[in-house]
Amino acid sequence: MTEKKYIVALDQGTTSSRAVVMDHDANIVSVSQREFEQIYPKAGWVEHDPMEIWATQSSTLVEVLAKADISSDQIAAIGITNQRETTIVWERETGKPIYNAIVWQCRRTAEICERLKRDGMEDYIRNNTGLVIDPYFSGTKVKWILDHVEGSRERARRGELLFGTVDTWLIWKMTQGRVHVTDYTNASRTMLFNIHTLDWDDKMLDALDIPRAMLPEVRRSSEVYGQTNIGGKGGTRIPIAGIAGDQQAALFGQLCVKEGMAKNTYGTGCFMLMNTGEKAVKSENGLLTTIACGPTGEVNYALEGAVFMAGASIQWLRDEMKLISDAFDSEYFATKVKDTNGVYVVPAFTGLGAPYWDPYARGAIFGLTRGVNSNHIIRATLESIAYQTRDVLEAMQADSGIRLHALRVDGGAVANNFLMQFQSDILGTRVERPEVREVTALGAAYLAGLAVGYWQNLDELQEKAVIEREFRPGIETTERNFRYSGWKKAVKRALAWEDHEE
């Protein structure tokens, strides 16, 4: 009898590193998770220690195999999914980072972005990379590191320094520096990659003065990139066979592989992606055009809207405002009041993402009267997640010309029934919550498993996509539109709050 085989997904997120073991029926066998430190050197700056990312991720891999009581020779393949855009530069020789990882949320490169706009680069960037000029993406972060670490640009030119997003960093460490690769989905988030020619863009590299020698090789999201022998008992070399940025992995894990299928992930931020097939749809409504995975991990395109603050705004209620002691309590308190009593919370703590793209917006609470209590504010904070999702969905429907009939949802906050019902109410659309919530890890596992023949094709996976609960709209159109118009008014007043040089 042959030994049972499994797939491991490594899910390197913004606040924690996780490892998930899955069996052939896409059941979760074991999970290991470790949080790591968030570093805030200045207001609006966010960093991680790349060595801590590696330490937490590698230890979860060892731990998850021990928990499942399986040896490394029972692992058919490893798939990697990661927080996107987060930028690491390290020495080729030693594997040591020259600076902390600059995280996707970090706004320190706003001035570099203003300069790109002044240089008339907006249309070029939108047309060739699919992105908008914003500190969110990796390109300006790489430039910042090269500008601020003495001698680094010259070293990069000599081939002594390497750049990578988190996937690239992990694979470099897992293969002891033998493999320097990324996949199309992660490359498409750097603002350095041409999504039409599927190659690094020389004009962008020149504009940001980034030597091409630093950049990883870009490969498909489902193929064998290299082998690793990390991971507990048994010294087998395990193929690393799938890579996708977290949102594209979730889209694949939800099996949204056909044109017009969409999902929203409610994590630290909120991310809605709609697969547009083999056609790159240019957005006229502040969305991103990005690369997604087709049925076999090949290049498809997607429209994406990013909301920076979703679960993070609930953490704010807990950690800074001390209104709740546990994120799960937010649902209980929100349902203790019948509405928000006219209050809107705009959680623009680090600016606003799609479709506004205003790094100078700041958080605000509007509509406060004497009768407002903490429950109203908790409820309004939860509702803000649903309103921001509607902002994005409206833009998507306008760009693609596709009316969405159902939204698939995943991420930590989907356990909140109040939020899911309000989401359906405010969209006027069915919201489908899957049985397996770990869709990001699932996507990475599927991509890796397909690459090594563990699963033959997506048809094999379709029956595993069980919808656990469907939420349907429960309010009238007039009420829906009235509430949403209040949100629009609140956002308008939060825009451009921080002064900046014109």
From Swiss-Prot:
Major enzyme class: transferase
Record comment: activity regulation: Activity of this regulatory enzyme is affected by several metabolites. Allosterically and non-competitively inhibited by fructose 1,6-bisphosphate (FBP) and unphosphorylated phosphocarrier protein EIIA-Glc (III-Glc), an integral component of the bacterial phosphotransferase (PTS) system.
Domain of life: Bacteria
The keyword Aminoacyl-tRNA synthetase is assigned to this record: no
Ligand binding (ATP): 14-16, 268, 311, 315, 412
Gene Ontology cellular-component terms listed: cytosol
Gene3D superfamilies named in the record: 3.30.420.40
EC numbers on record: 2.7.1.30
A GO BP annotation: glycerol catabolic process
Entries under InterPro entries matching the protein: ATPase_NBD (IPR043129), Carb_kinase_FGGY (IPR000577), Carb_kinase_FGGY_CS (IPR018483), FGGY_C (IPR018485), FGGY_N (IPR018484), Glycerol_kin (IPR005999)
Binding, glycerol: 84-85, 136, 246-247
PROSITE patterns noted in UniProt: FGGY_KINASES_1 (PS00933), FGGY_KINASES_2 (PS00445)
Molecular-function annotations in GO: ATP binding; glycerol kinase activity; metal ion binding
Reactions catalysed: glycerol + ATP = sn-glycerol 3-phosphate + ADP + H(+)
Binding site for ADP: 14, 18, 268, 311, 412, 416
Entry binding sites for sn-glycerol 3-phosphate: 14, 84-85, 136, 246
Similarity comment: family membership: Belongs to the FGGY kinase family.
NCBIfam families named among the record's database cross-references: glycerol_kin, PRK00047.1
Described purpose of this protein according to its UniProt entry: Key enzyme in the regulation of glycerol uptake and metabolism. Catalyzes the phosphorylation of glycerol to yield sn-glycerol 3-phosphate.
Record protein name field: Glycerol kinase
Biological source species: Citrobacter koseri (strain ATCC BAA-895 / CDC 4225-83 / SGSC4696)
The encoding gene: glpK
